[in-house]
Amino acid sequence: MLYNENNAPRRIIDSSLEILDLFTSPQQPFDMVVGILNGFHGKFINKLSDKYYYILNGTARVEINNEVFQVHSGDFVRVPANSKHSIDGRLKMLIICSPPYTPSSEEHCSE
């Protein structure tokens, strides 16, 4: 099968993040989306899924459990389940969630 971001369904998550649903299937152990970030997104805890970010282009500041990383094109970031995380910058990234992302598994953190 061939998947292309130009044909992917688009979702606006908030004022800073747009998601292109590249590959999602309840029968698979993961899902894969393209994220287009333009600002601050977070802080969240995903109770179910590990998240993996592959930075396609741009730069951002990623915070995972109070540890800060500056990321650039070509960087790969793992956010384990139950980790408080946020991302702030301008970039395009491939996001993989395993098991697949469900909105009910993610909680917004006030701090």
Model-derived features: positions:
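Glycine- and acidic-residue-biased ligand/ion/polar-headgroup-sensing regions
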Residues: 48-61, 65-66
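Short, surface-exposed charged micro-motifs
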Residues: 52, 61, 76, 84-86
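A generic fold-level signal
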Residues: 14, 27-29, 47, 71, ...
